[in-house]
UniProtKB/Swiss-Prot annotation:
It comes from Mycosarcoma maydis (Corn smut fungus). This is cAMP-dependent protein kinase regulatory subunit. The modification Phosphoserine is found at residue 170. InterPro entries: cAMP-dep_PK_reg_su-like (IPR050503), cAMP_dep_PK_reg_su (IPR012198), cAMP_dep_PK_reg_su_I/II_a/b (IPR003117), cNMP-bd_CS (IPR018488), cNMP-bd_dom (IPR000595), cNMP-bd_dom_sf (IPR018490), RmlC-like_jellyroll (IPR014710). Belongs to the cAMP-dependent kinase regulatory chain family. Residues 124-146 have a biased composition (Low complexity). 3',5'-cyclic AMP 1 binds at residues 295, 304.
Amino acid sequence: MSLPSSYTALLNDLNRDVARARPADALQFCANWFNSKLEEQRRAHLASNTNFATTNASTPFSHNSVGPSDIVDFGGAAPGLASPTQRASLFHSDPFAPGAGGGALPVASLAVPMDASQSPDSTPAPATPAAPAAPAAPAAPFSSLGGSGSTSISNAAFIPPTFNLGRRTSVSAESMAPSAANAESDGSPLPKTVIPKSEEQMQRIRGSIGNNLLFRNLEQDQYRDVLLAMKEVKVDANVTVIEQGAQGDYFYVVEFGTLDVYVRSPDAVSEGAPSASALLGDKKVSYGPGSSFGELALLYAQPRAATVLSTSACTLWALDRITFRSILMETNSRRRALYEKFLMDVPLFERLSAAERAKISDSLELREYSRGEAVISQGERGSEFFIIVEGDAEVRKTKQGGEEVVGKLSRGDYFGELALLNNAPRAATVAAAGATDDARLRVVTMSERAFTRLLGPLAGILERHAKETYGDEYSAVHANANADAATSVNSAALARSGADTSFPHPMDSSAKPGEGAWSAPNPFA
């Protein structure tokens, strides 16, 4: 006995979405997926209902009203989206496919039924107290979309998305957190979204977003991931790319074509049956190749402030909010874990709690240096601490009028940690090194002022741990001894390189190897 074709098609769609999303909870994902399909079916049924179509005929920007031929609608997020790494299943269909613009109405556009005599902003009269009654049965999940209930949306007026635009609203964002459950079975992260682009296209996108505040301070790897994740969207002439008052999900960069921007006054909808030009509003500006718009949609789901209408065939590059935020969050999560691992290897920080190390890692600032450029110079006052994230560095010391290389540093090594205790002069010069001229040194840095602002004076933290370990009478002595035992340059890295480590300690310029602060033991070792 053969299975119905609709059943087979439904299972194929489910298998496709499961393969894309790779849900941690397959049962919950399937339940949400079928509920979403059921809701789409009910909504499509209502859209074809005669009463609903008649009521909706006078609504501006509806699927059967006058105006632009199509309205771009990317749809909602896929059900069961457990984390941003599952963004591949966020959108179910191509919004620019033929016929996509005039499809089913979005859920957010379905208005709540209300009495004909009640305006959207009016306050209902208080209800007359009634005798206690038995608890009401739970409402059916799709009762508001039609059925046997006493109220039906097919009998209510359809309210345009701009009816409540002037009222104060709350701004919120999706809750997102990187989860190990969304990684591959071997523990590696899910593959990134990469859409091929030519170098010329990459350059045009860089030029369009280079001065945008959202992208200006992105790190190099984040910036590259954002560019690669943008997808190409082709739009015909006279298509509404974004509509004023609709929820925004996408940021666009114009590669080819022209678009006009219109802004409609809040009371334009209530002025009888306006023309198509009145519904669009006043033309404010035109966009051409290299322009960008919709960047606020990358931050939160806020209604669009204007309508953008294509005046010719256009090629756009689109980036959705979930992809953008997940790129930033996944990158920041990996970087934070890397920084915390580095901090655990620094003797001054080994007794900090996990929460304290997390605060420090979040405040570290990334810097880059070209080959031969000095990071710190011998003799200058130190106020910052450095950890090498990528690249190599040389430790140089001036001896008898000449500069000599006394050590080499690489990924994970640190230097300048005593700057968090005092502003003693630097004991050596640390400069970027590399095998090629284009080699780069990437370090993260933290100032003594930032450390004190987050955790308080480092000397106080050392004294606290000494007190916990040795008691009150030894706290100050051991805290000072621990501070004296630290070196301004990572001596472990110098020992590995076989370099001479006998330059004076920065806290005591008169000390010699084996004497004074240089040989002070570490009480926390």
